[in-house]
Amino acid sequence: MASLIYRQLLSNSYVTNISDEVSEIGARKTTNVTVNPGPFAQTGYAPVDWGHGELSDSTLVQPTLDGPYQPTTFNLPINYWMLIAPTQAGRVAEGTNTTNRWFACVLVEPSVQSTRREYVLDGQTVQLQVSNDSSTLWKFILFIKLEKNGTYSQYSTLSTSNKLCAWMKREGRVYWYTGTTPNASESYYLTINNDNSHVSCDAEFYLLPRSQTDLCDQYINNGLPPVQNTRNVVPVSITSREIRYTKAQVNEDIVVSKTSLWKEMQYNRDIMIRFKFANSIVKSGGLGYKWSEISFKPMNYQYTYTRDGEEITAHTTCSVNGVNDFSYNGGTLPTDFSISRFEVIKENSFVYIDYWDDSQAFRNMVYVRSLSANLNDVVCSGGDYSFALPVGAWPVMSGGAVTLSSAGVTLSTQFTDYVSLNSLRFRFRLTVSEPSFSISRTRLSGIYGLPAANPNNNVEYYEIAGRFSLISLVPTNDDYQTPIANSVTVRQDLERQLGELREEFNALSQEIALSQLIDLATLPLDMFSMFSGIKSTVEAVKSMTTNVMKKFKTSNLANAISDLTNSMSDAASSVSRSASVRSISSNAASRISTAIQASDDLRTVADASTQISSVSRSLRLREFTTQTDNLSFDDISAAVLKTKLDKSTQISQSTIPDIISESSEKFIPMRTYRVIDNDTAFETGIDGTFYAYRVDTFDEVPFDVERFNKLITDSPVLSAIIDFKTLKNLNDNYGITKTQAMELLQSNPKTLKEFINNNNPIIRNRIENLIAQCRL
């Protein structure tokens, strides 16, 4: 849209001429100052390094089989299996809690008749009765005594061909494997004090966490993995296990370089991306057997998660690109099921996820380099969608899946309800996965991809984990704003030129062709195309653009947006992060919502008119920060400005900044705004007029102030290019369909142009009145 020029001026109004800054500093200071801007481009798009760089891994990997350790005496950790692997018969291990429990384990070779053998247990030589009737299996025997000078009694046995046994301390008990392999299982025979019980082991051993009990079962019954038996694995001391493993700190801010004015900050962050798809399902008219469209739509999602103990508020926008159009036609009869178009994403498609959070990294995302990211993959599976037919069994679209794999990251801008946010755009390539999708009761089946009918499969969100790293150029002083050199003096000849130029601009309103104006208002005018028709400034576009931005920085519109942005930024960086982005945004919207009181407080129509007028003056900011495809007052004013700049004979490089700044404030002063709630439209004007009416009949209904207050906070605000009086006059004299009415209510540029080309006097008169308001 043409109003892109105003958005561009707002987002780039910080740009200044570096040489001017150096000259100004040198005039005030006696010391030499060197400004090195570094490898950054002063454009709307920061340079991006697509190299992955060095990516540290924040995952602490704990080995499943920890060992082998040398024979030793130590306090066995709670909730860990001690897997003992002796190589010969004899004493294997013993332990005690030093008060009322002594236990010992011995290993007996195969084919041993009942006999008494001597063992050294608890520092004493004792004789124990042992036996092993098996000719192939080794036998572990567990003995326990309850007194220091008591006698050991046999409690349990484990027969095994692998010469492996294991025990674990947990819940005040000792757990032990018993039975015969390959069907041995765990049990417990002893209650002890876990904190003070020590174990003395005469053989090599391993440690396994309790979470790997199933794996311990496998080792006991089937033996150790081959790598433990075929390689020369050297046992280490148990003291080596006391080394504390710490996670690498990946969420960090690093000062890369620093000068007097600027510093480069490297931000490394873990990231949790949550997103969901949105879709639109449109049913055709008729008997109810046909659907016109099933398509993907962009979807905003707000959520919170914890990063290094800090609660992060995040905002994502998910959109798709490169969709594939499919259709199904069951026949030509009105009762034949058909879908005119349904979208599917597959290998040639991309998914874009714009991510922003309230951390420090995103507050300084203006000039960025060395941007990289490392993300995992996610599988998105389609769910079922039933096509509700009036009669007969319902066809069901089901299945379909794609895998999203990271394909790069760049900078982007998210437009929230109140402000645009510098964010990261993660791009994902797609690969199709099982299952394919189909529509029951039709011949359509075996197609791969993810259809738009139910892409979320009734899950709350999809989640992707990973991390990103970037280097951002920020002011050295964290509280310092980027300096802007502003001129405070105006020469008398410049004021004279401006006076003459204003008169010429106002006279040129009669020479604007309405049809061409609508076409121009729908073009995305940028800085260059706006000024390309001015011959005297073509060779100095860069310098002139910088001067325009400097001047626009001081305009009322820029100041209002700046105040709104600052309040948004301050709220996002506050100590309390529990509120969502929408809740934070509502703080910035208080300038609008607090201007309206409850209907009980509106004593008279005059009071309501005063408050509605106050609200309407603030609605331009609300509309300005919400980008839509509909025509706005700023689109028309920018198109008028472009037309007059091309036609003017007195425009010059020195006068353009003032003219553009003035036009943003003075063009179309009598604006009217509209919000639509189902079949009811609320319309308010700068002059305090307000209407509520039905969109299908244009009959007025009572103006619900409380409902209006909620709508302007949560719903898009539209420019009322064709206001209520004009619409009612048009309907009374010419008659319009409901579709035409909705398109006029939404300021659809194509519909407006059709009425103008048909020389409709009511619409032409309304547009001409708006052009006449574009005065300086």
From Swiss-Prot:
Cystine connections: C318-C380
UniProt key word Metal-binding: no
Matching SUPFAM superfamilies: Concanavalin A-like lectins/glucanases, VP4 membrane interaction domain
Keywords: Capsid protein, Coiled coil, Disulfide bond, Hemagglutinin, Host cell membrane, Host cytoplasm, Host cytoskeleton, Host endoplasmic reticulum, Host membrane, Host-virus interaction, Membrane, Outer capsid protein, Viral attachment to host cell, Viral penetration into host cytoplasm, Viral penetration via permeabilization of host membrane, Virion, Virus entry into host cell
Annotated stretches, region: Spike body and stalk (antigen domain): 248-479
GO biological process: permeabilization of host organelle membrane involved in viral entry into host cell; virion attachment to host cell
Residues covered by region (Hydrophobic): 389-409
Motif range (YGL motif): 448-450
GO annotations of cellular component type: host cell endoplasmic reticulum-Golgi intermediate compartment; host cell plasma membrane; host cell rough endoplasmic reticulum; host cytoskeleton; membrane; viral outer capsid
Residue ranges the record marks as coiled coil: 484-511
UniProt site positions, description: Cleavage: R231, N232, R241, E242, K247, A248
Chain residue ranges for the region called Spike foot: 510-776
Record flagged with keyword Disulfide bond: yes
Region (Spike head): 65-224
Pfam families (alphabetical): Rota_VP4_MID (PF17477), VP4_haemagglut (PF00426), VP4_helical (PF17478)
Note: In group A rotaviruses, VP4 defines the P serotype. Some rotavirus strains are neuraminidase-sensitive and require sialic acid to attach to the cell surface. Some rotavirus strains are integrin-dependent. Some rotavirus strains depend on ganglioside for their entry into the host cell. Hsp70 also seems to be involved in the entry of some strains.
Family: Belongs to the rotavirus VP4 family.
Protein name as catalogued: Outer capsid protein VP4
